[in-house]
UniProtKB/Swiss-Prot annotation:
BP terms from Gene Ontology: innate immune response; protein ubiquitination; regulation of gene expression
Enzyme Commission identifier(s): 2.3.2.27
Positions of disulphide bridges: none
Pathway connected to this protein: Protein modification; protein ubiquitination
Protein name as it appears in the record: E3 ubiquitin-protein ligase TRIM4
Effect on the protein of changing C27S: Abolishes ligase activity
Zn-finger (B box-type) residues: 82-123
Subunit and interaction comment: Homotrimer.
Catalytic activity field: S-ubiquitinyl-[E2 ubiquitin-conjugating enzyme]-L-cysteine + [acceptor protein]-L-lysine = [E2 ubiquitin-conjugating enzyme]-L-cysteine + N(6)-ubiquitinyl-[acceptor protein]-L-lysine
Top EC class, one word: transferase
PROSITE patterns, A to Z: B302_SPRY, ZF_BBOX, ZF_RING_1, ZF_RING_2
Coiled-coil portions: 212-253
Organism domain of life: Eukaryota
Gene: TRIM4
Phylogenetic placement of the source organism: Eukaryota, Metazoa, Chordata, Craniata, Vertebrata
Amino acid sequence: MEAEDIQEELTCPICLDYFQDPVSIECGHNFCRGCLHRNWAPGGGPFPCPECRHPSAPAALRPNWALARLTEKTQRRRLGPVPPGLCGRHWEPLRLFCEDDQRPVCLVCRESQEHQTHAMAPIDEAFESYRTGNFDIHVDEWKRRLIRLLLYHFKQEEKLLKSQRNLVAKMKKVMHLQDVEVKNATQWKDKIKSQRMRISTEFSKLHNFLVEEEDLFLQRLNKEEEETKKKLNENTLKLNQTIASLKKLILEVGEKSQAPTLELLQNPKEVLTRSEIQDVNYSLEAVKVKTVCQIPLMKEMLKRFQVAVNLAEDTAHPKLVFSQEGRYVKNTASASSWPVFSSAWNYFAGWRNPQKTAFVERFQHLPCVLGKNVFTSGKHYWEVESRDSLEVAVGVCREDVMGITDRSKMSPDVGIWAIYWSAAGYWPLIGFPGTPTQQEPALHRVGVYLDRGTGNVSFYSAVDGVHLHTFSCSSVSRLRPFFWLSPLASLVIPPVTDRK
């Protein structure tokens, strides 16, 4: 139900105001008790209902408590600050000015019994008459109040208009910002679309380039395979021909040796000469694979996962010494015969002995050291450099390998996955002795790439990105960097470069 309908239901038809002590008469209509008393006939007999004219006796009045409570609650809700320009009793616009009471009233007040006989004028006309100066200087106080009220009303109206103008200006500004934001969003979407297409196009080019490079390397490898097969077949054919010739000569010599003495003495030099000139000194070259696995952009891709590896000096063999910043390590095993001079030389050369920490297991038999890093997940890449071309080994290992006593046992079987390398080449650490693989140019810097997701550790030439070897170490949950140095060998861990 609308607020106006509720107010109408709670308004007395006689005084046109909220019910005061409402009562019901025989016909069912409700009125204020005071309004009925003021309209009763002097004799006290039955009186007609002001609404339907049905006669009712004064004794038939019944208090309407429900209507009284509803009226009280409604009036209570409407208490509080009355907005300017509204009637404090009925919350209706003040459109009239009561000349008898000298105050503005609403249309409901005009119809009430209180103002039925009063003279009314529109509030704008009343204000205009006073504004134009049609009043004496000795005006009464009620006129001053009226003027103040009307001036306040128009000031408030001016403030509302000013506020409205400000709000309109703000709305225009916000709408402009909204248009700019929509434009920015559209441009951003276009840029995202363009960038997505650019990325897709560039990676498609890169993919095509890699496919072409793959085909080129495979063609080179196939060509090398055919040439090597041809050479091997030629060598095999030549060896077979030599073997057949030797067999024939052996039979011929055997037959000559069984011939009579006179026949043997007739021409012995021919057979002897043929056996002497038979050349069996063939130089068979070792078969090598010359086509290397060099993937373009491999170095750049690996450096995305580069990590800083620090040496755990408390795990190092006593013969290993470290630089002051801890990135260089050297094996001083050859200087063990003069330890005093060796210690002094290490001091002046900037080297220091490994730090000793109580209750930490270290390598006692092999010149090894571990890295501080412990890898359990993710992808990691680091580089190791050897500047003296002596034999070294780098890779990863389990944490419980410090007790190994024999170099020949360093292999995946004991939890070490590494490669040896020196000026002679490189070979996977799967036991001694190993057959080195030549690397051109000479290998002096190796990259180690550990992928815990696939469980593989791969080795690359850090100079040109050529793949060297890959181990599987997926069965181990914790891995650490591993380093082994031959006598007088040294290793350097380069600092991490910027990853882009």
